[in-house]
């Protein structure tokens, strides 16, 4: 199979990361979790007591992704592995705000494009098909109902030992959608040439097979 770049976009908790990891494994490609980059910068932002100067924050930031056979992708921020801190509630609640800043976005997109330059990448996020990889070989826009996404997020939280309420999560997800779709820089939107895949009520295996079928059509 020829080397491809695959872009998966969509709102929070639509299943992008889970599916992207599986696709990459099945296709012997590299998975790049772009959300982890923004979460890492958000983690630093919180550790530094929410500075307002994002240009300075980025100037002092070193960020890289490494790949461990057993642990998968690891995020190295300023020479420290911060992967295990990136799903904390405080990071989740601030990541949209931090990711909307131009300095943060420019820094992260440049990193992502460098990673994709050699192809063979499955990348998920909110602006991959529109901004990061506009020439991706396959663009998929994943959606799911707010209700289902809230249940998924609660399940993820439970697995991490975090107590959460579905109704509250529904509101947070709906608010996040509005923020992401209406921000000035790299808003969440479907690329004109992206294929929509609705994951509502579907198992991980079924969604993965649907997207694999799309890959095989172009490879």
Swiss-Prot record:
It catalyses: CMP + ATP = CDP + ADP; dCMP + ATP = dCDP + ADP. This is Cytidylate kinase. Its EC number is 2.7.4.25. Gene3D superfamilies: P-loop containing nucleotide triphosphate hydrolases (3.40.50.300). NCBIfam families: cmk. It comes from Staphylococcus saprophyticus subsp. saprophyticus (strain ATCC 15305 / DSM 20229 / NCIMB 8711 / NCTC 7292 / S-41). Keywords: ATP-binding, Cytoplasm, Kinase, Nucleotide-binding, Transferase. It comes from the Bacteria. ATP binds at residues 10-18. Belongs to the cytidylate kinase family. Type 1 subfamily. GO terms for cellular component: cytosol. It is found in: Cytoplasm. GO terms for molecular function: ATP binding; CMP kinase activity; dCMP kinase activity. Pfam families: Cytidylate_kin. It is an enzyme of class 2 (transferase).
């Amino acid at each position: 199979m020829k080397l491809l770049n695959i872009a998966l976009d969509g709102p929070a908790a639509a299943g992008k990361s889970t599916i992207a990891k599986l696709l990459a494994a099945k296709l012997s490609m590299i998975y790049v979790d772009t959300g982890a980059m923004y979460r890492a910068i958000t983690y630093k932002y919180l550790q530094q007591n929410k500075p307002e100067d994002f240009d300075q924050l980025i100037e002092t930031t070193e960020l890289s992704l490494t790949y461990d056979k057993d642990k998968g992708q690891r995020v190295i921020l300023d020479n420290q592995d911060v992967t295990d801190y990136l799903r904390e509630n405080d990071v989740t609640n601030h990541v949209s705000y931090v990711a909307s800043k131009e300095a943060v976005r420019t820094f992260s997109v440049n990193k992502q494009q460098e990673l994709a330059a050699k192809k063979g990448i499955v990348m998920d996020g909110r602006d991959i098909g529109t901004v990061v990889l506009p020439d991706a070989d396959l663009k998929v826009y994943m959606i799911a109902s707010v209700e289902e996404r809230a249940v998924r997020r609660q399940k993820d939280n439970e697995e991490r030992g975090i107590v959460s309420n579905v109704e509250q999560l529904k509101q947070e997800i709906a608010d996040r959608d509005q923020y992401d779709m209406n921000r000035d820089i790299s808003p969440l939107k479907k690329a004109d040439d992206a294929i929509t895949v609705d994951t509502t009520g579907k198992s991980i295996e079924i969604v993965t097979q649907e997207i694999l079928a799309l890959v095989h059509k172009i490879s």
